[in-house]
Amino acid sequence: MLYTGTDIIEIRRIKAAQARWGKRFLNRIFTPAELSLCKDRLPSLAARFAAKEAVIKALSLPKNQSYSEIETLNLPDGQPSVNLYGQALAKAITLGIKQISVSLSHCREYAIAMVVAQD
């Protein structure tokens, strides 16, 4: 079975949240590895936020899902990949998910992510 999720976000929303709450916002949403990879590049952070939302939709995770349990990093070839932890991982195991593929993109104003999970 295939499970899909898509999300789009205005990059300015991530910028506004970072301006309002600073590092506290970033540390609540992103893992240390994601923050290190993105180096405060807002389009990249926004795309990873969209990926987290897309995973939540694909796996039908609860609305209070911890974003830090969903991590989007890059493989050595640059392709994005998803790592799950905690409750997100438990749900994926329950669904029999064997693979999660993610595609990220952004332009000046928006970032988008598409996730396909398969058992």
UniProtKB/Swiss-Prot annotation:
Tree of life domain: Bacteria
Catalytic activity: apo-[ACP] + CoA = holo-[ACP] + adenosine 3',5'-bisphosphate + H(+)
Enzyme Commission numbers on file: 2.7.8.7
Binding site for Mg(2+): 7, 53
Principal location: cytoplasm
One example of a Gene Ontology biological process annotation: fatty acid biosynthetic process
Pfam families hit by this protein: ACPS (PF01648)
Chain's role: Transfers the 4'-phosphopantetheine moiety from coenzyme A to a Ser of acyl-carrier-protein.
Protein name: Holo-[acyl-carrier-protein] synthase
